[in-house]
Protein backbone atom coordinates (compact mmCIF):
# COMPACT_ATOMS: atom_id res chain seq x y z
CA UNK A 1 0.00 0.00 0.00
CA UNK A 2 2.81 2.39 0.91
CA UNK A 3 4.67 1.83 -2.36
CA UNK A 4 1.46 2.25 -4.34
CA UNK A 5 0.78 5.61 -2.70
CA UNK A 6 4.38 6.61 -3.27
CA UNK A 7 4.11 5.78 -6.98
CA UNK A 8 0.88 7.75 -7.25
CA UNK A 9 2.44 10.76 -5.50
CA UNK A 10 5.50 10.59 -7.75
CA UNK A 11 3.28 10.39 -10.82
CA UNK A 12 1.26 13.40 -9.67
CA UNK A 13 4.42 15.43 -9.08
CA UNK A 14 5.72 14.47 -12.52
CA UNK A 15 2.41 15.43 -14.12
CA UNK A 16 2.49 18.76 -12.27
CA UNK A 17 6.06 19.47 -13.43
CA UNK A 18 5.23 18.59 -17.03
CA UNK A 19 2.09 20.73 -16.89
CA UNK A 20 4.00 23.72 -15.54
CA UNK A 21 6.73 23.22 -18.14
CA UNK A 22 4.12 23.21 -20.88
CA UNK A 23 2.32 26.25 -19.48
CA UNK A 24 5.51 28.27 -19.15
CA UNK A 25 7.33 27.16 -22.27
CA UNK A 26 4.72 26.35 -24.89
CA UNK A 27 1.30 27.52 -23.76
CA UNK A 28 -0.12 30.85 -25.01
CA UNK A 29 -1.19 31.73 -21.46
CA UNK A 30 2.15 33.14 -20.24
CA UNK A 31 3.30 35.25 -23.19
CA UNK A 32 4.51 38.82 -23.61
CA UNK A 33 1.42 40.95 -24.14
CA UNK A 34 3.24 44.28 -24.04
CA UNK A 35 6.83 45.53 -23.92
CA UNK A 36 7.81 48.93 -22.52
CA UNK A 37 11.15 50.71 -22.77
CA UNK A 38 12.42 53.53 -20.55
CA UNK A 39 15.63 55.41 -19.78
CA UNK A 40 16.97 55.93 -23.29
CA UNK A 41 17.54 59.70 -23.72
CA UNK A 42 16.74 59.96 -27.44
CA UNK A 43 14.39 58.32 -29.90
CA UNK A 44 17.32 56.86 -31.83
CA UNK A 45 18.88 55.40 -28.67
CA UNK A 46 15.54 53.83 -27.68
CA UNK A 47 15.30 52.18 -31.10
CA UNK A 48 18.82 50.81 -30.59
CA UNK A 49 17.80 49.30 -27.24
CA UNK A 50 14.62 47.86 -28.71
CA UNK A 51 16.51 46.25 -31.57
CA UNK A 52 19.04 44.54 -29.29
CA UNK A 53 16.40 43.48 -26.75
CA UNK A 54 14.63 41.64 -29.59
CA UNK A 55 11.50 40.89 -27.55
CA UNK A 56 8.34 40.18 -29.55
CA UNK A 57 4.69 40.38 -28.54
CA UNK A 58 3.44 36.82 -28.10
CA UNK A 59 6.85 35.48 -27.11
CA UNK A 60 6.78 33.03 -24.20
CA UNK A 61 7.81 34.79 -20.99
CA UNK A 62 9.83 31.77 -19.87
CA UNK A 63 11.93 32.01 -23.01
CA UNK A 64 12.84 35.65 -22.42
CA UNK A 65 16.15 35.29 -20.57
CA UNK A 66 16.83 38.49 -18.65
CA UNK A 67 20.58 37.93 -18.47
CA UNK A 68 20.98 37.34 -22.20
CA UNK A 69 18.83 40.34 -23.09
CA UNK A 70 20.79 42.55 -20.66
CA UNK A 71 24.11 41.34 -22.06
CA UNK A 72 23.04 42.24 -25.60
CA UNK A 73 21.88 45.71 -24.59
CA UNK A 74 25.07 46.38 -22.59
CA UNK A 75 27.10 46.11 -25.78
CA UNK A 76 25.95 49.69 -26.41
CA UNK A 77 28.80 51.85 -25.00
CA UNK A 78 26.43 54.55 -23.71
CA UNK A 79 24.54 52.09 -21.49
CA UNK A 80 25.50 52.09 -17.80
CA UNK A 81 23.00 49.53 -16.48
CA UNK A 82 19.98 47.48 -17.56
CA UNK A 83 17.00 46.18 -15.61
CA UNK A 84 14.43 43.79 -17.10
CA UNK A 85 11.26 42.57 -15.40
CA UNK A 86 8.49 40.19 -16.48
CA UNK A 87 4.98 40.34 -15.04
CA UNK A 88 3.53 36.84 -15.18
CA UNK A 89 0.02 38.10 -14.37
CA UNK A 90 -0.52 40.72 -17.07
CA UNK A 91 2.24 39.65 -19.47
CA UNK A 92 4.05 43.00 -19.40
CA UNK A 93 7.80 43.06 -20.01
CA UNK A 94 9.64 46.19 -18.85
CA UNK A 95 13.09 47.10 -20.14
CA UNK A 96 14.70 49.94 -18.20
CA UNK A 97 18.14 51.30 -19.03
CA UNK A 98 20.36 53.83 -17.32
CA UNK A 99 22.31 55.95 -19.79
CA UNK A 100 25.75 57.30 -19.06
CA UNK A 101 25.67 61.04 -18.37
CA UNK A 102 28.33 62.92 -20.34
CA UNK A 103 30.25 65.67 -18.57
CA UNK A 104 32.38 66.72 -21.55
CA UNK A 105 33.38 65.92 -25.09
CA UNK A 106 36.75 64.21 -25.12
CA UNK A 107 38.64 64.16 -28.43
CA UNK A 108 35.29 64.43 -30.22
CA UNK A 109 33.48 61.77 -28.15
CA UNK A 110 31.20 62.08 -25.14
CA UNK A 111 32.78 61.11 -21.82
CA UNK A 112 31.22 60.48 -18.40
CA UNK A 113 32.63 60.94 -14.90
CA UNK A 114 34.09 57.42 -14.96
CA UNK A 115 36.15 58.23 -18.04
CA UNK A 116 34.01 56.06 -20.33
CA UNK A 117 33.90 57.40 -23.88
CA UNK A 118 30.89 56.85 -26.10
CA UNK A 119 28.61 58.20 -28.81
CA UNK A 120 24.89 58.67 -28.24
CA UNK A 121 22.50 57.84 -31.12
CA UNK A 122 20.55 60.98 -31.88
CA UNK A 123 23.24 63.23 -30.43
CA UNK A 124 23.46 65.22 -27.22
CA UNK A 125 21.96 68.71 -27.22
CA UNK A 126 23.28 70.20 -23.96
CA UNK A 127 26.43 72.29 -24.17
CA UNK A 128 29.49 70.54 -22.77
CA UNK A 129 33.11 71.58 -22.30
CA UNK A 130 35.33 70.45 -25.14
CA UNK A 131 38.48 68.64 -24.01
CA UNK A 132 41.42 67.42 -26.06
CA UNK A 133 43.93 65.21 -24.29
CA UNK A 134 46.57 62.56 -24.90
CA UNK A 135 44.92 60.07 -22.56
CA UNK A 136 41.86 59.56 -20.37
CA UNK A 137 43.66 60.51 -17.14
CA UNK A 138 44.69 63.86 -18.57
CA UNK A 139 41.22 64.40 -20.01
CA UNK A 140 39.57 63.77 -16.65
CA UNK A 141 41.98 66.20 -15.00
CA UNK A 142 40.97 68.90 -17.49
CA UNK A 143 37.28 68.18 -16.94
CA UNK A 144 37.70 68.31 -13.17
CA UNK A 145 39.41 71.69 -13.53
CA UNK A 146 36.54 72.99 -15.65
CA UNK A 147 33.96 71.82 -13.11
CA UNK A 148 35.85 73.51 -10.26
CA UNK A 149 35.98 76.88 -11.99
CA UNK A 150 33.41 79.52 -10.94
CA UNK A 151 30.51 79.77 -13.39
CA UNK A 152 31.27 83.37 -14.32
CA UNK A 153 34.74 82.16 -15.32
CA UNK A 154 33.99 78.77 -16.87
CA UNK A 155 31.22 80.05 -19.17
CA UNK A 156 33.83 82.10 -21.04
CA UNK A 157 36.28 79.25 -21.51
CA UNK A 158 36.67 76.89 -24.45
CA UNK A 159 38.98 74.32 -26.01
CA UNK A 160 40.53 72.72 -22.94
CA UNK A 161 43.72 70.85 -23.82
CA UNK A 162 45.70 68.57 -21.53
CA UNK A 163 49.12 67.27 -22.50
CA UNK A 164 49.19 65.77 -19.01
CA UNK A 165 47.35 66.33 -15.69
CA UNK A 166 50.08 68.87 -14.87
CA UNK A 167 49.88 70.73 -18.18
CA UNK A 168 46.38 72.01 -18.90
CA UNK A 169 45.58 75.09 -20.97
CA UNK A 170 42.47 76.69 -22.47
CA UNK A 171 41.09 79.76 -24.22
CA UNK A 172 38.99 82.39 -22.48
CA UNK A 173 37.01 85.33 -23.84
CA UNK A 174 37.77 88.75 -22.42
CA UNK A 175 35.56 91.23 -24.22
CA UNK A 176 36.62 91.11 -27.87
CA UNK A 177 39.86 89.33 -27.02
CA UNK A 178 40.52 85.62 -26.70
CA UNK A 179 43.36 84.80 -24.33
CA UNK A 180 45.35 81.61 -24.08
CA UNK A 181 45.66 80.60 -20.43
CA UNK A 182 48.28 78.04 -19.45
CA UNK A 183 46.86 76.78 -16.17
CA UNK A 184 49.22 73.96 -15.24
CA UNK A 185 47.52 71.52 -12.85
CA UNK A 186 44.17 71.79 -11.10
CA UNK A 187 45.59 72.97 -7.78
CA UNK A 188 45.32 76.49 -6.30
CA UNK A 189 42.35 77.34 -8.52
CA UNK A 190 41.03 80.18 -6.35
CA UNK A 191 44.49 81.74 -6.07
CA UNK A 192 45.13 81.43 -9.81
CA UNK A 193 41.85 83.18 -10.60
CA UNK A 194 42.78 85.98 -8.20
CA UNK A 195 46.16 86.40 -9.92
CA UNK A 196 44.50 86.24 -13.36
CA UNK A 197 42.10 89.07 -12.50
CA UNK A 198 44.89 91.16 -10.98
CA UNK A 199 46.99 90.79 -14.14
CA UNK A 200 44.11 91.83 -16.41
CA UNK A 201 43.48 94.89 -14.28
CA UNK A 202 46.96 96.27 -15.03
CA UNK A 203 46.93 98.85 -17.87
CA UNK A 204 50.15 97.47 -19.35
CA UNK A 205 48.42 94.12 -19.93
CA UNK A 206 45.60 95.52 -22.06
CA UNK A 207 46.93 93.84 -25.20
CA UNK A 208 48.35 90.59 -23.87
CA UNK A 209 47.32 87.35 -25.58
CA UNK A 210 48.76 84.77 -23.24
CA UNK A 211 48.94 84.20 -19.47
CA UNK A 212 50.97 81.41 -17.89
CA UNK A 213 49.70 80.53 -14.41
CA UNK A 214 51.60 77.29 -14.01
CA UNK A 215 53.29 78.95 -11.03
CA UNK A 216 50.77 81.59 -9.91
CA UNK A 217 53.40 83.24 -7.71
CA UNK A 218 55.51 83.93 -10.79
CA UNK A 219 53.01 84.39 -13.65
CA UNK A 220 54.14 85.13 -17.18
CA UNK A 221 52.26 87.34 -19.65
CA UNK A 222 52.91 87.82 -23.35
Stretches with model-predicted labels:
Residues 1-36, 43-60, 67-71, 75, ...:
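Charged, solvent-exposed interaction patches on well-folded alpha/beta domains
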Amino acid sequence: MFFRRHRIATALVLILILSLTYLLGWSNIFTAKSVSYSGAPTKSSQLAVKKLADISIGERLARIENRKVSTRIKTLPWIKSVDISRNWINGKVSVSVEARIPIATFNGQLMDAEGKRFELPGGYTEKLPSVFARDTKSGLAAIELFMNLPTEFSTRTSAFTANSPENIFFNIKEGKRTLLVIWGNGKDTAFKIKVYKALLALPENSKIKKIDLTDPRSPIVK
